Amino acid sequence: MEMTVTRADVQKILGDELEALRSRIIANHVAAKQVASGRTKDSIKVELTENGGILWGRFPFGTLETGRRAGRTPHNFTGIIRQWVIDKGISVPPIQYIREPSERWKPKYTPKERGLMSMAGAIAHKIKTEGTKLYREGGRNDIYSPEVEKTVNSITDRVGLLFEQEVEHINLNTKNEDGHNK
């Protein structure tokens, strides 16, 4: 019975472990109620390469545990926050106009849109000047950090066991100078 550890064996272990890691990270992300649009969750992908594997996620993936620090924001940040408010289903009180519509003036936005833009602007300003609430509170370490460590340990154990079995097999098949098994 020929027993040889192949690259395919190692790739299978790696693929299985990375897929399990992906699932656990998504479950932690959902349990922490961080999902709004689902784009970050949907962006987490496993890619196996010739020499290893990669777990990919969109750019803000790292902020799931750290939050976003204050500072420069992307173009149209208020619009991004506006969409986040909508995706999260946050209720926003409308802001009524004081001025009455007339022939010379028609409101550009509905009261509901005004309330949404006002809230999005306030949130965007707070993040730009102070960072997200998660960042201000020191972050967390339960979304992906412990899961990555578990996965690395599991891969190490499983691949190590494969090679340990291979070495035992080699030892069993070695012969001494007389041609007899040792």
Can you annotate each of these PLM segments?
Residues 1-52:
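Charge-rich, low-complexity N-terminal segments
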Residues 39-182:
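Charged, low-complexity interaction tracts
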